[in-house]
Amino acid sequence: MALCLGRGILVAPEVTNAHLLVNFLNGMGVPLQRYLCDLDVTGNLSAGRDVEQLLPDRYELDQRVIRFVSIEQANLNAWRVRLCEVFDNGAPGFIDVYEFEALDPDHPFGTEWTFDSVDGALRFARDVLRTSQGRYVNQGLIQDEYKDRYHPEW
């Protein structure tokens, strides 16, 4: 399954550094489809490709905490939901939320739950972590979500 970027531009799912490609095409004025439809979310997860979603921020000790959910295939019959909470350490030219300081140093990669189905993982993310349908992105695009929501001036 290819990722449709608009104007008939298709990108193979094997493309790495998707956020670099998206930024390049966006700079060329190519309209991009950032958010995945429900079918793409379940299809990606069933095929072993991760999806992510930026959640509303919160504050801890007067510092903004960036929150995002990642859903990934843990093994052949299990899917992992991960809640990542990191301090907003971003700066112009540094928007890699994966590298930001973790809120909880004992869980640098977030808190994880495992489910035996894609539907179970998505239902938990929706009901407990308050994700929204239609707001999932492919892995690697969460940085763009972060920049656009919290620091559009960069």
Describe the function of each predicted region.
Residues A2-I66:
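Negatively charged, low-complexity tracts enriched in Asp/Glu with abundant Ser/Thr
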Residues F24-L25, L55, I95-V97, R149-W154:
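Long, C-terminal folded domains that constitute the functional core of proteins
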Residues L55-R58, R67-S70, E99-A102, L122-R123:
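Intrinsically disordered, low-complexity boundary segments flanking structured domains
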Residues A2-C4, D104-W154:
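Acidic, proline/glycine-rich low-complexity IDRs
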Residues Y35, R64, Q73-A91, E145-W154:
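A cross-kingdom feature marking charged/low-complexity
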Residues V41-N44, D50, S70-F109, Q139:
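Short aromatic-glycine-(Arg/Gly/Cys) micro-motifs in beta-strand/loop hairpins
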